Amino acid sequence: IEAAHGRAPAVATGVKRSNPENIVFTYQGDGDLASIGMAHTVHAAARNENITVIFINNAIYGMTGGQMAPTSLPGQITQTSPYGRDVNHCGYPIRVCEMLSQLEGPEYLARVTVNNVKNVKNAKKAIKKAFENQVNGKGFSLVEVLSSCPTNWGLTPKKALEWIDEKMIPYYPLGVYKDRSLQGKED
């Protein structure tokens, strides 16, 4: 099923509630989820809807020409911020996992990346956990994947992978931001 831009969590909620046995997930970019779809994402998380959200954060509107996204980094140059994102004018980037972790509803929130083999393995584990949570009826899971956009970043693919390490991860730290299955357990 294809949903209107930003509305995937609302559509996924309807599909899951009407067909609870189905595995339902959304695959959304940062322009979709963190901009026009933010309200739908927040409320699905707050209600702990039993869906899985895969959120691709490449810090740019990659499919429409490279405009500044809600997740573009401070100082990041884009088509609509040719001198770099000015936080005094455009505000700060939205850290989705950190924001959603303040809600009581979500079952699982994690941020991963896919810029090397080790990180791909960790991403697979996080995505598997998110789908297992849904299968087991535990509720809302979101996995944010820091991803490259070499074309719109104006970088080679190799440099784009390095940019994730050098620029994105310091601003968007990797890790599990919420896992209710671990609450109350000692490490």
Question: Where do the language-model regions lie?
Answer:
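Short, hinge-like loop/turn segments at secondary-structure boundaries
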Residues: I1, A44, A69-L73, K159-E162
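Thiamine diphosphate
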Residues: I1-G62, K125-K129
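Conserved thiamine diphosphate
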Residues: E21, A69-N136
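Short, well-ordered, mixed-charge alpha-helical segments that flank or form enzyme active sites
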Residues: L33-I36, I60-G65, V117-K121, C149-W153
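Active-site-proximal loop->helix
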Residues: M38-H43, M63-I77
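Compact, aliphatic and Gly/Pro-tolerant "microcore" segments centered on a short helix or tight beta-hairpin
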Residues: V53-I54, G66, L100
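Short, structured patches in soluble enzyme cores that scaffold and shape functional sites
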Residues: F55, R111-T113, E144-S147
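Flexible, low-complexity linker and terminal segments
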Residues: V135-D187
